């Protein structure tokens, strides 16, 4: 649907208000609710599933080492309004159709509060999954300042629940961040980017079968689809919004919350975007971009300087297609900045943040090394199933790092596409990438490299929890598995892949 662009103002997510707060802890109650919200001036209200009635949900702000507790409450209907495939793993008919569980993405969190897919719960906790342990989640927030996000992670339903609107920001701050000369308060804005398809009545559309499925196909109906690309782009819950800004520097925390789509972002006036942080916090030094690629679940913490563009408009654009070439009338556009607000007070002319260097990588000193391959097969209906190391979700656990150990993971991607790989619990670092011959690999299983090791680009040299594993490459990452033991997961963050079956349990053992 080609709606008029830049007619709705960008909403700024509200900050969550705690129910209780004392020196020992901060306690929130956040409900998942079905609401109807206006996403565009010319559309009727859209049915959405939200946290506390808004998309994005309320932003939780925490200081480092502040203990936060959240009671996530499912107040959703008993029937899903998007097409549920009961044939994929854990889609059992004897379980509630609507299941939820919340994962703090990038959070270093005890296993019982991590949002394990089988720790799901139904409305008012009437039914719970086999790994359910607690109604109130605990977040210690021992991490450095970083931009995290929370979203649904229910088994076999993540793609639908997140598409319905279950996502929000979680920001951790610390004394080091506060010492930097960065834009703050109203000049520090989170941007949640997602793609959707709408019907004429404003309803969300999500396909019930893969494209070009014959009418007489024996595929289940509904059936999971291998990917989803919407032609309409939302930022903070509005379609192609605009933001009025002052001629000064702004900090934007950009999150790709799309199911499948990777964006290649740039400004239409070719202005430089200064990146200061990635998934797990600040980079060792700032990086200047003319454009950058951001895959599902990745975060880019950036500064845009509008001081030279008073009374001008600038459009944040996307040059990456999704299943087809980008359309200049639709998905090539993200949002518009109008530099029309008068400058309030004094704005810093330059930024002089002194960032901390990260410790050197020492892969040779790792306690263990694993080689893990992104693979796939077909189910009995001929549908693709993407896998991690040829293992299904229900197969025995094979990734079992010892608590406190350092491991190197060699992630081999012989598939034809990029997969954003996410590890729970840890913030890892990228060692290098190396291209290999996928044809030889597919025929013999042998990895024959076609080029040298390539150091990660500057923007990937910080702490990451999600990394783009490109086709025809081996990417090496290194992580220390601390500070909690227990059951976690790692998976592809293309949600249609994660739900079937590109996700594996991971046990951190004592």
From Swiss-Prot:
Q: Which family does it belong to?
A: Belongs to the multicopper oxidase family.
Query: What is the primary gene name for this protein?
Result: cotA
The effect of temperature on activity is:
Thermostable. Optimum temperature is 70 degrees Celsius.
Where along this sequence does the record place binding of Cu cation 2? 105, 151, 493
Q: Which reaction does it catalyse?
A: 4 hydroquinone + O2 = 4 benzosemiquinone + 2 H2O
Spell out the SUPFAM superfamilies in the cross-references. Answer: Cupredoxins (SSF49503)
Entry keyword Transmembrane helix: no
- Function statement: Multicopper oxidase that catalyzes the oxidation of a variety of substrates, including phenolic and non-phenolic compounds. Substrates include 2,6-dimethoxyphenol (2,6-DMP) and the non-phenolic compound 2,2'-azino-bis(3-ethylbenzothiazoline-6-sulfonic acid) (ABTS). Cannot use guaiacol and catechol.
Q: How does activity depend on pH?
A: Optimum pH is 5.0.
The record places domain Plastocyanin-like at: 45-79, 99-174, 242-317, 372-506
Question: Listed GO molecular functions?
Answer: copper ion binding; hydroquinone:oxygen oxidoreductase activity
- Listed binding positions for Cu cation 4 are 419, 492, 497, 502
Any idea which positions bind Cu cation 1?
103, 422
Q: Which residues form a coiled coil?
A: none
Looking at the UniProt record, the site noted as Plays a crucial role in the protonation steps sits at 114, 498
Q: Provide the alphabetized UniProt keywords.
A: Copper, Metal-binding, Oxidoreductase, Repeat
- Please summarize the record's notes on activators and inhibitors of this protein: Resistant to alkali and organic solvents such as methanol, ethanol and acetone. Resistant to EDTA, which might be explained by the spatial protection of copper ions in the active sites. Inhibited by DMSO. Strongly inhibited by Fe(2+) and DTT.
E.C. numbers: 1.10.3.2
The record ties this protein, via Pfam families, to: Cu-oxidase (PF00394), Cu-oxidase_2 (PF07731), Cu-oxidase_3 (PF07732)
Residues annotated as binding Cu cation 3 are 153, 424, 491
Q: Which organism is it from?
A: Bacillus stratosphericus
Question: According to the record, how does the cofactor bind?
Answer: Binds 4 copper ions per subunit.
What CDD domains is this protein classified in? Answer: CuRO_1_BOD_CotA_like, CuRO_2_CotA_like, CuRO_3_CotA_like
Describe its applied uses.
Answer: Exhibits efficient decolorization ability towards indigo and crystal violet, which are extensively used in textile industries and biochemical study, suggesting a potential application of this laccase in industrial processes.
Q: Which cofactor does it need?
A: Cu(2+)
- This chain belongs to the protein called Laccase
């Amino acid at each position: 649907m080609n709606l008029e662009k830049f007619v709705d103002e960008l909403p700024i997510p509200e900050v969550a208000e705690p129910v209780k707060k004392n020196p020992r802890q901060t306690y929130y109650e956040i409900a998942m609710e079905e609401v109807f919200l206006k996403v565009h001036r010319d559309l009727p209200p859209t049915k959405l599933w939200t946290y506390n009635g808004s998309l994005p949900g309320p932003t939780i702000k925490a200081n480092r080492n502040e203990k936060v507790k959240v009671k996530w409450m499912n107040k959703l209907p008993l029937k899903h309004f998007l097409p549920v495939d009961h044939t994929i793993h854990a889609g059992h008919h004897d379980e509630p159709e609507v299941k939820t569980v919340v994962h703090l993405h990038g959070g270093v969190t005890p296993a019982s509060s991590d949002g394990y897919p089988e720790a799901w719960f139904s409305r008012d906790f009437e039914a719970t999954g086999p790994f359910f342990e607690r109604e109130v989640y605990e977040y210690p927030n021992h991490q450095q300042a970083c931009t995290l996000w929370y979203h649904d992670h229910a088994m076999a339903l993540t793609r639908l629940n997140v598409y319905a609107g279950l996502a929000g920001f979680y920001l951790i701050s610390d004394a080091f961040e506060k010492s930097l000369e960065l834009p703050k308060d109203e000049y520090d804005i989170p941007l949640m980017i997602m793609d959707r398809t709408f019907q004429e009545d404003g309803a969300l559309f999500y396909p019930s079968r893969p494209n070009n499925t014959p009418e007489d196909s024996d595929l289940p109906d509904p059936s999971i689809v291998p990917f989803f690309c919407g032609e309409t782009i939302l930022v903070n819950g509005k379609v192609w919004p605009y933001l009025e800004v002052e001629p000064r520097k702004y900090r934007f925390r950009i999150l790709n919350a799309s199911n499948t789509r990777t964006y290649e972002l740039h400004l239409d006036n070719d202005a430089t975007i200064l990146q200061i942080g990635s998934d797990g916090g600040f980079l060792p030094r700032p990086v200047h971009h003319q454009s950058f690629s951001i895959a599902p679940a990745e975060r880019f913490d950036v500064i845009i300087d509008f001081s030279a563009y008073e009374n001008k408009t600038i459009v944040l654009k996307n040059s990456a297609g999704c299943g087809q070439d980008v359309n200049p009338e639709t998905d090539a556009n993200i949002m518009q900045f109008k530099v029309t607000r008068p400058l309030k007070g004094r704005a810093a002319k330059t930024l002089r943040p002194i960032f901390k260097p990260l410790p050197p990588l020492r892969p040779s000193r790792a306690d263990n090394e694993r080689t893990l391959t992104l693979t796939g097969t077909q189910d009995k209906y001929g549908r693709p199933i993407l896998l991690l190391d040829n293992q299904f979700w229900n197969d025995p656990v094979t990734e079992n790092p010892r608590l406190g150990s350092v491991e190197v993971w060699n992630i081999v991607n012989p598939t034809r596409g990029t997969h954003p790989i996410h590890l729970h619990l840890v913030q890892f670092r990228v060692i290098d990438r190396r291209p290999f011959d996928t044809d030889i690999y597919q025929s013999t299983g042998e990895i024959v490299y076609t080029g040298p090791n390539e150091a990660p680009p500057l923007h990937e040299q910080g702490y990451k929890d999600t990394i783009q594993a490109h086709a025809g490459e081996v990417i090496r990452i290194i992580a220390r598995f601390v500070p909690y033991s227990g059951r976690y997961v790692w998976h592809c963050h293309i949600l249609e892949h994660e739900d079937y079956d590109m996700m594996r349990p991971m046990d951190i053992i004592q």
